[in-house]
């Protein structure tokens, strides 16, 4: 399938600063339609050039009635395509088209019930339940202080709540719709149906954005971009670089060389697993750099978390540079940049340069390398990357593995990093993860790991007193990693893990369980 086809039916989301904006985009992608997120003050020429079949105005933290409130470019309402305003997006639509927005005396945050009115094209036949009087009701998620007090000319009432008489409005002649609630969050139970109604039925988008089509499209573009040139990839064993490796190998075969820097701070047998998966099973050219001694020497005596991160980052770059300098024919450097990196680096007018954050697996690159950048995942969200990985033949337990920090165990060993500590921690962490999988709890937690504490504690083994190290288990549940709850793992499970760690690892005398949520604690300890 050609590049134009898969991107042809597309939606543009103008971002007014909502924490849920990326969620809107992910919901549209899940339907099978391509979309992009741009700042609300994007240049008008870019909006026209984008060629959207429909436009969505996101929510946002500002008040429409305030000075310098962000507004949609007026041309949005003149392009002749359907427009959906969500929360703030509805309010700015109302205000810009001649309606009126006021600061509501009753603010609405959280669950609400909305009554649908008028059998509009957007909400017709979409309901959670029906009242005895025959009114269709929707269970939704609200988050607003302002509300529309007067609709613009040509609009009719589409939805209301007890506190918000105009919770939805529609100009069906122009296909302009505004809803005060958030269809993109799971708490709005019919939200995905509403988004699909807008994107597919009202905007006329076909479902071309599928995993198979994305792979075909990516391969065609990589081949077109690279030609017969050689490509270099820093392979970390993480999800993004692993999927890039699999995709590039499928596209260009032996033109790809991966450099895998093993810094001695990986998980149990992870280095061997990376080599087994990519070099042996898939036949990819992988250069493994055994750099444990180099990293341990660089980290010796340093206890400050930020300085440790910088030391590990610099050491990684040095090792990568040394190896890549030996590869004379390479023209391209591949990276695992994904779409959230791109969105987060493009602010509104204040910083519209669209500079991509240096999310380099390889840190900074030496200027004399002069490599072109290849970022085959830069259009994809993390969940799309994972689906791509499975479709490309990577094992799902690798693709859906819990997040692991770039500095690895270096930030899970509190204080100074030593080889002895890393070896102890690796084994303890392996036991914890192994038991989580055996108890079918691994996929029920969002992230789980073990932390090595730089303290000793008294224990008794047999009749002997022992004075040795302490580790802490950490497991959390989260949707977005912005907030997280400590995982309420069963006591008998924790007891089993603790017993195994203390019995099987001679240098550990005590196991604790971290019951801190985020906030105030962070997920990682350093």
UniProtKB/Swiss-Prot annotation:
Domain Glutamine amidotransferase type-1: 10-208
Catalytic reactions of this protein: XMP + L-glutamine + ATP + H2O = GMP + L-glutamate + AMP + diphosphate + 2 H(+)
Residues that coordinate or bind ATP: 236-242
Pfam families: GATase, GMP_synt_C, NAD_synthase
Signal peptide bounds: none
UniProt-recorded Gene Ontology molecular function terms: ATP binding; GMP synthase activity
GO cellular component: cytosol
Group of enzyme by EC: ligase
InterPro entries: Class_I_gatase-like, GATASE, GMP_synth_C, GMP_synth_GATase, GMP_synthase, GMPS_ATP_PPase_dom, NAD/GMP_synthase, Rossmann-like_a/b/a_fold
Residue stretches making up the GMPS ATP-PPase domain: 209-401
Catalytic site positions: 87 (nucleophile), 182, 184
PROSITE patterns: GATASE_TYPE_1, GMPS_ATP_PPASE
Keywords associated with the record: ATP-binding, Glutamine amidotransferase, GMP biosynthesis, Ligase, Nucleotide-binding, Purine biosynthesis
Pathway it works in: Purine metabolism; GMP biosynthesis; GMP from XMP (L-Gln route): step 1/1
EC number: 6.3.5.2
Function of the molecule: Catalyzes the synthesis of GMP from XMP.
PANTHER family: GMP SYNTHASE [GLUTAMINE-HYDROLYZING], GMP SYNTHASE-RELATED
NCBIfam families documented for this protein: guaA_Cterm, guaA_Nterm, PRK00074.1
Subunit structure: Homodimer.
Record-given protein name: GMP synthase [glutamine-hydrolyzing]
Species in which this protein is naturally found: Hydrogenovibrio crunogenus (strain DSM 25203 / XCL-2)
